[in-house]
C-alpha cells in the first residue's frame, strides 16, 4: 500500500499525535486511521460506505485525503 510513503503533514484533514492510535496518521479529531480509507477502497467499498462505517469522518475530509494522495503521486 502506498499510503505510508506520502507526506501527510501538508494535508489539513489529518493529524498525527504521539500515543493516539500508535502515532498513525488519522482523520483529524478522530481515531480513524487514514490507511482505513485506502484499505476499504481497495476491498471494493465506496466512499459512501466508508462514511457510514466511520461517522466521525466527513466527506470533505475524505476528498481532501484523496486529492492529497493524487497530488502527491503526480509530483516528480
Regions found by a protein language model. Name each.
Residues 8-49:
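A short, structured beta-strand/loop element
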Residues 1-4:
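Short, intrinsically disordered or compositionally biased N-terminal tails of bacterial proteins
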Residues 32-76:
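Long, charge-rich, low-complexity alpha-helical segments
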Amino acid at each position: 500500500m502506498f499510503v505510508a510513503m506520502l507526506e501527510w503533514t501538508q494535508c489539513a484533514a489529518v493529524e498525527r499525535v504521539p500515543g493516539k492510535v500508535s502515532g498513525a496518521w488519522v482523520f483529524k479529531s478522530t481515531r480513524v486511521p487514514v490507511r482505513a480509507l485506502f484499505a476499504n477502497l481497495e476491498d471494493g467499498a465506496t466512499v459512501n460506505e466508508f462514511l457510514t462505517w466511520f461517522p466521525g469522518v466527513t466527506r470533505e475530509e475524505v476528498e481532501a485525503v484523496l486529492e492529497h494522495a493524487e497530488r502527491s503521486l503526480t509530483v516528480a
